[in-house]
Amino acid sequence: MANNKSSNNNELLVYGAEQAIDQMKYEIASEFGVNLGADTTARANGSVGGEITKRLVQLAEQQLGGGRF
């Protein structure tokens, strides 16, 4: 039966992950030449977020033996 609790709670599961993700965010923004902030376009911010996701997936695949699921 379905659980009524939302699975999208943004709760950190790994201690220190927030700092690592923030560091990754600023490194990628620097690589892309994006200045993060309120004046940055959604497209620019989205490109940084998309790249974070891409790199996290690559890291997970490497740790799982490089297999695709």
From Swiss-Prot:
Extra info from the record? SASP are degraded in the first minutes of spore germination and provide amino acids for both new protein synthesis and metabolism.
> One Pfam family for this entry, by name?
SASP
Q: Which organism is it from?
A: Priestia megaterium
Reply yes or no: does the keyword Transferase apply: no
Judging by the UniProt lineage, the source's domain of life is Bacteria
The UniProt keywords, alphabetically, are: DNA-binding, Sporulation
Protein's recorded name: Small, acid-soluble spore protein C4
Role this protein plays: SASP are bound to spore DNA. They are double-stranded DNA-binding proteins that cause DNA to change to an a-like conformation. They protect the DNA backbone from chemical and enzymatic cleavage and are thus involved in dormant spore's high resistance to UV light.
Q: Where is this site: Cleavage?
A: E27, I28
In which family does this protein belong, per the annotation? Belongs to the alpha/beta-type SASP family.
Recorded GO molecular functions are: double-stranded DNA binding
Biological-process GO terms, alphabetical: DNA topological change; sporulation resulting in formation of a cellular spore
